Amino acid sequence: MSARSAKFMYRSGNAGASGDLSVEYGTDLGALTRLEDKIRLLSDDLESEREMRQRIEREKAELQIQVMSLSERLEEAEGSSESVVEMNKKRDSELAKLRKLLEDVHLESEETAHHLRQKHQAAIQEMQDQLDQVQKAKNKSDKEKQKFQAEVFELLAQLETANKEKLTAMKTVEKLEYTVHELNIKIEEINRTVIELTSQKTRLSQENTELIKEVHEHKMQLDNANHLKQQLAQQLEDTKHRLEEEERKRASLENHAHTLEVELESLKVQLDEESEARLELERQLTKANGDAASWKSKYEAELQAHADEVEELRRKMAQKISEYEEQLEALLNKCSSLAKQKSRLQSEVEVLIMDLEKATTHAQQLEKRVAQLEKLNLDLKNKLEEVTMLMEQAQKEARAKAAELQKLQHEYEKLRDQRDALARENKKLTDDLAECKSQLNDAHRRIHEQEIEIKRLENEREELSAAYKEAETLRKQEEAKNQRLTAELAQVRHDYEKRLAQKEEEIEALRKQYQIEIEQLNMRLAEAEAKLKTEIARLKKKYQAQITELELSLDAANKANIDLQKTIKKQALQITELQAHYDEVHRQLQQAVDQLGVTQRRCQALQAELEEQRIALEQANRAKRQAEQLHEEAVARVNELTTINVNLASAKSKLESEFAALQNDYDEVHKELRISDERVQKLTIELKSTKDLLVEEQERLVKMETVKKSLEQEVRTLHVRIEEVEANALAGGKRVIAKLESRIRDVEIEVEEERRRHAETEKMLRKKDHRLKELLVQNEEDHKQIQLLQEMVDKMNEKVKVYKRQMQETREGMSQQNLTRVRRFQRELEAAEDRADQAESNLSFIRAKHRSWVTTSQVPGGTRQVFVTQEEQSNY
């Protein structure tokens, strides 16, 4: 396997047949684990966002409580102002000028209230428009979220398919390397066989030339014999009749001797052939031993049996060779004895005239031998032609295999280059995916933090609304107190008019005390209303002028002044409490503003990260397109490799190991595909869970919107109450209301900003949903591609079965050829043994049957007599 980095290199069978589809199914199963880790990070980010929203909701509830407390305090302030108004009504008769001034102030407050109402209505309208915009933005964010989810699913599917294709391509590259190595080995073996055939051819040609030389020598001997025949024809006529029988016997003996010589020569040739066959068998044995060592795991039993057969043949051949050597020694001894007899006979023939018939018969025998030698020569030529044909066929096959090997080497180099390129691209894609996923995790985390901040701000808004309500209640209480004070002042003024005459002396002391108390009140009011000092100073001057005018009529109002002092002390205490409460509310609002600034900065950072994620997603899409193009090229290469495999059918007998390896690789590919399918199913389940979480978050957003609407309704009711209170409030209360309204506006602005940020987060969520949907679509496409690859694997399995069948057939054919060769060698050996036995039997038979002696004697008178004694033994 190639880089069982699940580099799933599809090489001629998805692990050997994807033509170098180096899509790292690397083995890159690490990519799937990375995706799972990133999905876990996304779920963690969702949980953190939920926590942010919960915190914002809590802060919103706290703000609502604060607004309620403020409204209650305002109501209390209105009650206290009503008591003050009642006191002022009692004193209206004495303080006409003061009433006019109060009416002027009331008109001014009404005008300010009218302006405030208009502003408030405009603000409410703006808030309604903003709410509509927020709703639209929420819908857009939902859509974008769905798109983002689809994109996430598509990316996951693309990653899985890319890894699978890479693994298959790596496998195919390794398979092709293995096949090329085996083909090189086979080509080396073929070259060895070609060299052996050429050596056999040269040897046979040498033997042929030697045989031709021998034929020429025999022809020369024939010519010499014919010449001798012509010379001795006249001399042999007299002795011809006597020596016919003896010459026939001698001729038969010589024929036997010559046949023995020919047989000896044939036996020598056969021994040479057998020695060569022995060498070939030894070579085959060495080859078989090498093959047994290399293919021991698969063909150990067959090779062992073959080795045993070869060893038995070797033993037989050794025995036969030893027997032949012994027979040769015996024949050589016989030949030496025959040669001695022949030399003796030739000397006798030279002496005797009767040798002429022997020469004639010898010539006839030589002609027969020449005919036999010519027949042998023709047979040898036929054998040579057959051997040359076989050699040419072997050379053609070797050339074709060499060309195929060159093609395979070229294809292998291309596939290796493509594998390296695919590995580099796969690394780049994995790095880009890792960066994208890290960016996605950061974005989810930031979105979660933003949602938490939104929840916290909503809780703060609720607390501020509660504080606002409390302030309204306090304001109402203060207004009631002011009304009571005005009523008491009116009563005091009426008493002053009745008691002017009686209490002129006490007026100065009362005036001093009253002035001191008014100064204390003014000081406390200045502390409570820092922004309204100018108006309080103006009122103070007016009250001082009125008091100077009424100094003569305030002697009788000592008791009323004491009561007023008590009420003023109470009011001062209430004002101090209100001031402290206002300071706390202001501090909380400042904290809310700071938190809003932090959330704004976070939103900006999230937007920048989203843009980076979009860029990364575009890069991932580009990488996906490149991977698809590479996949198509790899499919084309797979087709080319299949054609190459068809062309390599001639070498079926030696490719069984390749097909077995291919089958194992196919099984591994099936297993890896199953594992990848299980992982895809797990990822789909996790994506479904993330979808459910997103749906829950959307439901929570809907709930938040309902809460916002309810809060807006509460704000409207509070505004209505404020308007009612403003109609009856005094200048101080109206100023307090104006302050509170300004603070409420600030809070509303902050809430609007938070809504805007929330809308942006919803947009981001919609984009993520869209991306997730796209990723799901990609996952489906990858499943389809996996099915196509499975079909390709099935087709390649069928091809492997066909190849195996062909391999078995070729193996059977080769085994039959080997058997026929062995049988032919055995037959030839048996024939040689039979011939040797026949020669021995003939020699022994001739020796036993025919024994002759030639003697010569010199007769007086110069005549020479030759006596031939012949002994024949016949066995009946």
Swiss-Prot record:
Keywords: Coiled coil, Cytoplasm, Motor protein, Muscle protein, Myosin, Thick filament
Disulfide bonding pattern of the chain: none
Subcellular location per the Swiss-Prot or TrEMBL entry: Cytoplasm, Myofibril
Main location: cytoplasm
One Gene Ontology cellular component annotation held by this UniProt entry: myosin filament
Residue runs in coiled coils: 29-855
Coiled coil in keyword set: yes
SUPFAM superfamilies per UniProt: Myosin rod fragments
Family under the similarity heading: Belongs to the paramyosin family.
Function: Paramyosin is a major structural component of many thick filaments isolated from invertebrate muscles.
Subunit structure and binding partners: Homodimer.
Name of the protein this chain belongs to: Paramyosin
Organismal lineage: Eukaryota, Metazoa, Ecdysozoa, Arthropoda, Chelicerata
